[in-house]
Amino acid sequence: MVVAVEASLYLDVFFVVLMLAIAGELHALNDAVAAIRSPAGGPGHAVPARAATGTVDATSAAPSAYKAMVGVVSRHQLILASIRELELVMNHSIFLLLFLNMLNICVHTFVTAVLLQKEVQPTTMYKMVSTLPIYMYETGLYCIFGQTIIDQGERLATSAFSSGWPECGVRFRRVLLVFMLRASQPLQLTVGQMYTLSRHTFLQLLNGSYTLFNMLYQIQGNK
């Protein structure tokens, strides 16, 4: 029993750390794309002489901004790949965990309600009451950090628009447009191909537990 509890704890820590790492990368990516500016002072600045003679492309007047945007796109692709890999690993195990936690919340709430109607020892009641928050905390942990990834992903398009794109060249704007189109698609972790780790899912699980509890309580009352 102790080994199973420790294994579950280590698994939770492992997945939470990975989710935090992805959320942190998205936060850093938001800051990076919003900070991109043209070092040359805008598209109307003087073009170097070599550009006029044809030795340098005129659109490369601010190459650092373009290169920075290409780096942002590459970094974004790595984050997308990481989310897909993490989703693949969490798909079945976390779905089963959330489902069992929903059942455990229902059962513990039902047993606590029944015990309150009877004369039981305080230690028994304490065990039931103290166990219930553990399942709620574990479920909320995954959903809250999953929501963090969603929130950071939704910021990407706004951060891109907040960059210094008006003062950058055409190549930069094209890459930025492609990035914004891709960033408009939601970044989220889905388990069991039906549950997205988010605040809404957490509320759904609690609502499911309450529905089951209400059904069991009505059956118990009819006896």
Language-model-derived ranges and their functions:
Residues 1-223:
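Membrane-embedded alpha-helical segments and the immediately adjacent membrane-proximal loops
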